[in-house]
Structures are given as C-alpha cells and as structure tokens.
Amino acid sequence: MFYNFISKDSILYRLILCFGIGIGTVFGLSPFSFFSAGVFASISCIFLFFSLNRTSIWKAFLWLLILSQILNFTAFYWIPGAISRISGANTFVSILFFFLYGLISHLKFFLFYTLFRFSKIDSASKTYILLIFPAAGTLSDMITFQIFPWYWGNLISGSIVFEQFASICGVYGLSFLLLFISSTFLILVNYYKYKNSKEFKTSIASLICIAFIYRFGLYRIGYINQSQNELKPKNLSVLMIQPDTSPGTKDLKADASYLSATMSKVFSLAIPTFENSPSLIVIPESAIPFHGTIDSEENRKEKIYSSTMEGIILYLSKHTGADVLFNELNLDENKLRNQVSLFKNLDGKTERYNKRRLLPFGEYLPMEKNFPFLRSIFQETSRYVPGEFPKLLIGNKIQNQRSFLPPEISKLNEPKTYRYEFSSIVEHTNKIRNLEYSYSILPLLCYEAMFTELVLDYFQNEQKPEVLINITNDSWFDSELEAYQHSGAVRLRAIETGLPLIRSAVSGISEVWDARGIPMIVPIGFHETGTRAFSIRLDAIESTIYTRFGNSFLWIFCILILISRLIFVSRIERKS
C-alpha cells in the first residue's frame, strides 16, 4: 500500500530511508538507548540497499555520500564546534572538515553496500539475507577506519541482556546480532501468513537462536552477581573527582590565575572529607593541563614541569595513604607524551602509560611534514607522540592506612619536602609489612576506550588487568550528547572484559560499571562539579571468551558466509 504513493526508485523514498538510518542511530545510541531505534535504523538500511540495487553503482555511491552527511547532521552535529575548539580552526574550516569527517567515518557504508550488492539478494523476503546482511555489516565495521567510532553493535545498548553477548563476540558480535535480529523480523513479517513455508520455519529457527542469546544474557547477569570470590575478596575503595574546569587552550598556558584556580579546585575536591581514606584517587584527563611531574632538564626548559602539580600529587598520597591516578604531559627524549600516571604510596614511585591512539587534529596534525601550513590553520593542535606498547599500572592496597597530615600545605610548590617523607626506610618497611594485595589497572586515555582492539592487547600477556580506568576530557566538545555517546560506547568494554570500569571525565559524564555493564554509582552529570566515593570488587573469576579469542572466529565466520554466497552466485551466473 505504501508503495502506491512513493516509488522505490524515487528521491523522496531514499531520503526517508537515509533519515531513518540517521534518526534510528541517534536514538539507538546513548543517552536515549532505544533498542527499537537500532532495529529501525538497520531495517531502513536494508530497504535503502535494495532501492540502490535498482540503479547504477555510481549513483548508489552518490546516495551513500548523501547518507554519510545526513548521519552527520542527525547523530553527530556536535562535531563542527568540537573541531573549532580542539584545533583552533575557524568556522569555515570546521564546517569543511565536518563534511570530510562524514565521508571518512562512514566509509563503512560503501564497503557494506558493495558486499551486499555483489551478493545478489533481490528481495528482503529471501532467507539468504539472514546471514549475508549481518556478515557484510559486521565486516565493514571491523575493516573501515573511523575517527569517532560507532558500530552497529552500539545501537543495541537499549538491551542490557542482549549486550551480554559482547562477552563472547565483543561489540562486533553485537553488530552481527542487531543486523540478524532485523533480518529475522523482516522474514517473519513477510511470511507470518504462510506458516508452512520454508521461509517462515527458517525465521522461527532464527528466533530460537535469538532467544538462546537472550537467555545467555539473563544467565550472565545473574551468574556474575553470584560468583564473586568470597574467600579472599579484593575490595578497592576509590575516590573519583570531576572538577569541571574549562579547557586549557594555549592562550591560558601562561595565565597564572587560571592555573592556580584549576589546581586549587582539583586539590580541594581530592582531599577526602570522610573518616575512611580511599585506596585510590582518580583524577581525570587535563584536570591540571599543560604540565607534568618529571623534574627533568627538558621539561624545565619547555616549562612543562610543575613543582606545584607534583606537590599536589605527593600531598594527596601522603595525606590519604592512597595511590593517585592522574593525567600529565612529559617530554621523553624530546617526544611529548600524553600519559596516564599512577603515583604509588607504597614506594613513592610513579608508573606511566603513554597514550597510543592519538586524536587527529587535536593531539597531532596528520600530514604536517608534507603540508606545514596546516599548523597555521589548526593552531590549537598539540604535538604529542604516540606510545608504542600497552602497559598495566600496578597499585597496592595497604592495610591500616590512616589519614594524617603531612608537612605544611603551604609547601605544595616545594615537592622535595614530600619526597623526603616517602624515602623513609622505616615507613617503607612498615608499608610492605602491611601490604594487603596489589592490583593491576588497564589505563585508557580519552577516546582510546572506544577501540576494543586497544583493550584486547592487554590480555595477550601473562599478567591480566583487574580493573579498567578511563580518564577523559570531553570539555573540548562542549556537547552533552557527545558526552553520553562517548560514555555509552565505553561501557561495552566492561562487558567484553568481564571487569569493572571506572570512567572519570573532567566535565562529565563520570560513571562506574560492574562486569555486566550495570551502573554502580549515580553518575556525575554533564558540567557538574562533584566527587564519588565507592568500593569495587577486583576478584574476577575467569577471563571472558572474548578476551581469550578476540575477533578471530567472527572474522572467519563472516568471511566464509560471504565467500560461500559469492561462489554460489558465480555458479548460477555461469549456468545462465
């Protein structure tokens, strides 16, 4: 009936489907997280692909280009402002880059459609679509480069039960699941009147598979809640702060009043007001911008080292007996590193992880060597150098740690005073005697947490992480929608790894999830100032299937499906 009014070949029909994908995407992602919206987006994608099959591939690609920009304007409209604030580019350049971003980040639709088109499926009622459509979409998710990554699997966030499937197949497995559910729905709708048909029976078999996955999700939610190690529980008390300080633009680097106010705010929030001190204090990315705590000649020369910043970290640890996790910048052989650092109360030493996945045009300038003039356009862009290796940060829980006052607070800019306190042999020996346990942190800096591959790296070694901590600075984006989309994508890392995840953001959203991706605290909202004190369990019973095998089986499965279909199509064409 619908097609009596709108032709499948019409511009209006295709525009409606493009907007269906865009609107379904924005409402499928956080903070809305409507499961039905994700299904709606994927079904719109199916019908768009069938409509594009009726035209030339070049016209189809033109429509996919239009789709990429519609997605930009509906789901990621905050990007132009973010580009301007992060890089210092003017409005014209930011808008131009916005269009370019839409093309690059949505290249997956071009691959997705190409795989689908050459699979020669001529109708949404064909049962082949049950596997071909999900396999093509999942492969395109896994292969194509994205700057701010979103996957079809992120659109399943409205169902915490289905999300548990990520512990087996990761976010890409959720992509396959969502597209499989949508394809099953279409087959079922087309053949529900023909209950004796092969197609209807196939759709019922698909529904049974989906029901098994749902049952697994229910089981995992209950199982993890009941399977904590009660014999030797490892409870880690944490204090997380959100200072909501303004972004550190380059013109503020020499502003003493700005830096003083920023450091004072961080310091006042991080000093616990309760009787029981935490074992770990988490300070978000760029809470204290521009500076680092390594007192080296090159850091002093470039005015990166801050004695006050070092004094604050030492004071907090001495006052509370806690380890302190924070973000800093340091020069390492003339290479500027963006780091997650853990100051350890046990021995007064600092472990550091160098950020590996840098943000283009924010933390480094692509092609700057070939086009040096770009620096004059993107003036706020930093010159960070990426790290090469994953690195766990090892903290320590010490028994009977009590809050007490270290040397005078007036000496914050004289860290040598505090360093001396940590060098006491007697005190160090006493701490070792009272060491309860050590714990391992998987550090993720800013949007690194959106890339599941960066997390899987840590599970290839003998020593495994016990908690994921993502410190981030979303204040550059100044968009509540972006903050929720970023946070929602990060949450899946907890389910994939079966580990608790702490997300500390300088301006929000700051959250904590357990191994099932279920919130453990009331989040600190966007542009709120606050703290959260909580306790997490670090006694994961076993690794998830996903951390043991990664994406290998899903790669093989999707490739075999598409190759089998292409072989089948080529044989049919030869016979004809």
From Swiss-Prot:
Keywords, in A-Z order: Acyltransferase, Cell inner membrane, Cell membrane, Membrane, Transferase, Transmembrane, Transmembrane helix
EC number of the protein: 2.3.1.269
Superkingdom classification of source: Bacteria
CDD domains in UniProt: ALP_N-acyl_transferase (cd07571)
PROSITE patterns given in the database record: CN_HYDROLASE
Record keyword Transmembrane present: yes
Primary localisation category: membrane
A GO biological process held by the record: lipoprotein biosynthetic process
GO cellular component: plasma membrane
Gene Ontology molecular functions: N-acyltransferase activity
Functional pathway: Protein modification; lipoprotein biosynthesis (N-acyl transfer)
Positions annotated as active site in the UniProt record: 285 (proton acceptor), 355, 446 (nucleophile)
Ranges for domain CN hydrolase: 236-538
Compartment(s): Cell inner membrane
Record-linked InterPro entries: Apolipo_AcylTrfase, C-N_Hydrolase, C-N_Hydrolase_sf, LNT_N
A Pfam family the protein falls into: LNT_N
Function: Catalyzes the phospholipid dependent N-acylation of the N-terminal cysteine of apolipoprotein, the last step in lipoprotein maturation.
HAMAP family in the record: Lnt (MF_01148)
Full protein name: Apolipoprotein N-acyltransferase 1
Gene coding for it: lnt1
